[in-house]
Each structure stands twice: as C-alpha cells, then as structure tokens.
C-alpha cells in the first residue's frame, strides 16, 4: 500500500504533538498549545527526575520516546531493529543531571525531526508497517499526556484559554 494519501495527515498529527498547534486550532492539542518539545523546555532536570508512584519520571518517558523514534528511523532506512530492542532500558534511569536532560531533549528533537520526514515522504508499506506509523502518533500522544500529568510545568493551555 502506498502512503501518498496519508502523508499530510500523518505529518500534521505527529508535528502538532511535537511542535504545537499552528493557526486557529488543532486536532490533538488545544489552541495555542506549544507541543511537547517546547513544553519540555520549561521542565528542569530536577522536575524531570521526579518519580511517580509507578516509578516512572518525565526523563524516563522522554528517553523511551526518543529511543522508540530512533528504532522507527532505523526501520525507515531498511533495518529491522525491533527484534533486539531493549525497551526496558529507558525506564531504568529515572533521574538526570541538567546536561543529561538537555541531551535527552536533543535526542527527542532530532529523532522526532527525522521521523517527521519519514511520515511526510510517500512510500510503499505493508499493513503492519502502516499500523506502526499510525501507532507512533498514538503512542506519542499517550506519552505527552503522561508527561503532562507528572509536572505542571509541562502542561499545555486549558481548553478555556482559547
């Protein structure tokens, strides 16, 4: 199946989650929401290191998403990186220093930018691959929500602030 008819949709939804809402409104986030990357700029390393009752932290969420995007980017280049993937690794390190926090945000930004190019570029895919591409957007939305539940500094604008 070709993704030609879907690339704009995939790009818009993923881009909105990462970079925020442009124009009058969005499909995933509230009007004027700055998106994940700019929200994370307002989170200190100390705040990113606070663990929840389940043991996760914002730093762990960001590491997990950055790692997942790196695997997707490798897949887009013809590799099959999923068999040996260590999904648990990102969740093991919950606290970060300021330099480590900056590095995690840079990795997320860079891997997200690469994945955005993949989403906007028409390609031939199997159903399972298209499911993974669409699933990456839903998965990112989950983590945006989870991060925003952990720290008030990462929260976007309320619907009433339109």
Where are these regions (language model features)?
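Acidic/histidine-rich alpha-helical segments that form the ligand environment
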Residues: 90-141
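Short, contiguous alpha-helical
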Residues: 1-33, 37-40, 45-90, 124-162
């Amino acid at each position: 199946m070709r993704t030609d008819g879907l690339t704009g949709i995939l790009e818009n939804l993923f881009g909105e989650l990462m970079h925020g809402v442009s124009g009058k409104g969005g499909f995933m986030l509230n009007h004027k929401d700055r998106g994940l990357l700019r929200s994370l700029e307002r989170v200190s390393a100390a705040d990113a290191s606070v663990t929840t009752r389940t043991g996760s932290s914002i730093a762990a969420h960001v590491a997990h998403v950055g790692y997942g995007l790196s695997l997707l980017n490798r897949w887009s280049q013809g590799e099959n990186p999923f068999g040996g993937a260590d999904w648990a690794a990102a969740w093991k390190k919950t606290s970060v220093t300021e330099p480590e926090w900056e590095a995690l945000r840079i990795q997320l930004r860079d891997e997200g930018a690469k994945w955005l190019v993949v989403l906007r570029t028409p390609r031939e895919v199997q159903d399972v691959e298209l499911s993974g591409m669409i699933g990456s957007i839903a998965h990112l939305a989950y983590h945006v929500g989870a991060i925003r539940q952990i720290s008030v500094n990462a929260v976007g604008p309320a619907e009433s602030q339109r």
